[in-house]
Amino acid sequence: MVNALLPLVCLVAAAAPPRYAVEVNRPGPDGMNVLFDSVHHPETTDFAINNGPSHVLLLDGTDALVIRSCVHRHGCSTPGNPDVITLVKRTAKGPIDLSNLQGQFEKNSLDKIIVRPQGADEQCGVQDPRITVDRKTGRYLMAYTAFGDGTAHPNICNATACGPTWQQCSHCCKSVKTKVVMTKTPEVASSWVRVNRTGDDGFDAKSTATLVRDTPPHFQWTGTGTVRSWQSEDLFHWTAAEVAIAGRPGSFDPGYCEAGAPPVQLADGNYFGTYDTIISGAKRHGWAAGWVVLNGSNPREVLQRGSEPLVEPTRPWELQTPPQWNWTQAVQEGGVPMIGATNGLMPLGGDVFLAWACASDSVVEAFVVRVTKW
């Protein structure tokens, strides 16, 4: 008999990744979740078109939105009526009143403009801002889409020459790319400085959401059609692109995907993010949004992706239902049902967020999103 201690070997199954459930509700009376509606509530905005909102918690503890805005309804995103970016603050303090969101924000007035087009490659607009803050340095970073054509001759691409509609100006408005501005005083328009960034091919494609971390690397998600992730040690040079979010044939998002909001951290350390998409199916179509949970240790890893849309167009302001909503930008663009530009996530506490988006490219919307870990 061998009197020896044999090693005890235990086989332990690898832990399954956490799973999350996401619940979405529309705040406001009867789900009327619209803000900055220039037609039905002109007292809330000086701009005919208000869309593409992004959220930031200012360093003084005030919630703020940056909004893509056009002064006139017709010919938005042309040299004569380009998109600008405004910043409006929440005036109320304490817990947010979900039944009266509009009443807690400043008017989106002309004096709230913080970024205007500069140069031929922005002559048609500065669009779809996504803002975040580096709390270690006190520096705000805002990525936006520059829309124009840097090669166009100024004699044929100006407010007088190219006409009042986008169709007449299409030859002047055909290039898009991400640019970034930074400041330590976000309400002061003159303080925003365009920064020079470099990177591997495609780092400055249209639509960029940035995750600034206390310790590098930092990350960004960029692109339309397919979203890729990038990393940086200093927020100025971006490398090592990887596919992050691509279309899923057979799912609600079979093809087009576009970067959404800067990710927000969940209680367990992972991140929650959004993306825009074009849904398709027998009973649904149009612009909508999806969601992902990213690994807190490696935000480039998608731990879970929603099997159903986060939000999809079902209400009159998203379907352009006449006569109340047939004035919107989306009608001019062909009348496609639309919830787009889910560019902001506002933490409410306890893994509950306000997701900011726009309806029909014309008004701001908000949705309450509750994330639950299994």
Regions found by a protein language model. Give the residues of each.
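ATP/pyrophosphate-binding catalytic subdomain of soluble kinases
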Residues: E258
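Cleavable N-terminal signal peptides of Sec/SRP-targeted secreted and luminal proteins
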Residues: M1-A15
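Beta-rich carbohydrate-recognition and catalytic domains
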Residues: A16-C124, V133-G255, Q265-G335, L348-W374
